[in-house]
Amino acid sequence: MAEENVIFVGKKPTMNYVLAIVTQFNNNSTSRIVIKARGKAISKAVDIAEITRHKFIQDAKYDEIKLDTESLQGEKGESNVSSIEIVLTR
């Protein structure tokens, strides 16, 4: 899958990500988009997927949802961070 079909969720407003997904579905004629998030952004990723499905692209469906734990090196040693991948298809 092309990297352009991946949305990395961070600190931007939720609707920015929703708009990016809607734009990719409409302009790139892609049928599959992956939403990725880690840590505190996981709840925002779920909100983004739900807003996209219920308000903008009603025929979008969840193809796959992956949960994982990633180990990150920080100042205080290694820490575990949860991550999610939500695959939307149309």
From Swiss-Prot:
Annotated family: Belongs to the histone-like Alba family.
General function of this protein: Binds double-stranded DNA tightly but without sequence specificity. Involved in DNA compaction.
Protein name: DNA/RNA-binding protein Alba
GO CC annotation, single: cytoplasm
Positions of post-translational N6-acetyllysine modification: 11
Originating species: Picrophilus torridus (strain ATCC 700027 / DSM 9790 / JCM 10055 / NBRC 100828 / KAW 2/3)
Single GO biological process annotation from the record: chromosome condensation
GO molecular function: double-stranded DNA binding; RNA binding
Database matches in InterPro entries: Alba-like_dom_sf (IPR036882), DNA/RNA-bd_Alba (IPR013795), DNA/RNA-bd_Alba-like (IPR002775)
Main location: cytoplasm
One Pfam match: Alba
NCBIfam families for this protein: DNA-binding protein Alba, PRK04015.1
Modifications after synthesis and translation: Acetylated. Acetylation at Lys-11 decreases DNA-binding affinity.
Subcellular location: Cytoplasm; Chromosome
